[in-house]
Amino acid sequence: MKIVDAKVIVTCPGRNFVTLKIVTDQGIYGIGDATLNGREKSVVSYLEDYLIPVLIGRDPQQIEDIWQFFYRGAYWRRGPVGMTALAAIDVALWDIKAKLANMPLYQLLGGKSRERILSYTHANGKDLDSTLEAVRKAKDKGYKAIRVQCGIPGIAKTYGVSTNTKSYEPADADLPSVEVWSTEKYLNYIPDVFAAVRKEFGPDIHLLHDVHHRLTPIEAARLGKALEPYHLFWMEDAVPAENQESFKLIRQHTTTPLAVGEVFNSIHDCRELIQNQWIDYIRTTIVHAGGISQMRRIADFASLFHVRTGFHGATDLSPVCMGAALHFDYWVPNFGIQEHMAHSEQMNAVFPHAYTFNDGYFTPGEKPGHGVDIDEKLAAQYPYKRACLPVNRLEDGTLWHW
């Protein structure tokens, strides 16, 4: 069996997605997500100019050897562009292999470890009242876990909170927009938000919060301590992820569970965090960390230290990644939770899929492969549109972490 064709499909049904399609000489094909939010074209070039020419003629069943070839053979290892491109190849090959076996991907991975997959969604509001209403709507849809983000008084725009659309999309401008940030206003207000949410909805719903890398370690420790009475499921991305020892200091000061990893692209990015048990959940994504092959290694390593998975699952990842992640979630023993932001009807039409949602939980479906396809004719109707992520400045003008 040989790979005879591979192509990159770029489409924008409401936001940009990059998809790799690999075709074999038996007519079986697989697809993988290659979307890197705000840097999509860089992955397209990496695939088309460097990886696809080498991929043609290889046996698609040799997934591990192909992965090692592109990782070790690149010399310039790791990095978001290269690992996203490698992930697209890896997921497409797993899709092919499962189709060859005529079984859903989770069966090929080892079979299911649970009957359904717990997910969380986002509840965002420009103020406290609208945030409480967003939580109520999410709860009414059946979600048992909800990430809560709220506008901060005195800050014009806050991460996670939409200002002009129903669905929050941070990559919203042709060139990076500038947002203003105040750490002190944020730290003074957010504990009150969670106090109000707990008072309104009680102790039984799981609550999560994303800091989005905005704090120093001691500031994050302060926030984690202040949130302890409200028993969060996790506090996410509390500090910039480059210095893993930052989490050691946070851990020393608070029992609020910690999650990190959506910007990671290698097991080496999270090795110290996991083995020192400085985090509780690893959020590394299949699409940005080299695919299923490396995520298996990360999850297996994490299981040795009681760290569970909590994959990133916002709409900056296509339904292709969501489908692959759900099959992984179904199988992985140390599963924690799966993020879910609903794709639009437009997006779902371009990417028909077998996975389903019911009462706060997902199942990946029984279709062979990862169960997600792409309608190429429909995808062609939505051309690429450049969209950049914002940048942050403090109130005095200092550039800050977005």
UniProtKB/Swiss-Prot annotation:
Active-site residues, as the UniProt record annotates them: 159 (proton donor/acceptor), 212 (proton donor/acceptor)
Keyword entries, A-Z: Lyase, Magnesium, Metal-binding
Requisite cofactors: Mg(2+)
EC number(s) from the headed UniProt entry: 4.2.1.-, 4.2.1.8
Enzyme category, top tier: lyase
Annotated catalysed reactions: D-mannonate = 2-dehydro-3-deoxy-D-gluconate + H2O
Chain's role: Has low D-mannonate dehydratase activity (in vitro), suggesting that this is not a physiological substrate and that it has no significant role in D-mannonate degradation in vivo. Has no detectable activity with a panel of 70 other acid sugars (in vitro).
Protein name (database record): D-galactonate dehydratase family member RspA
Name of the gene: rspA
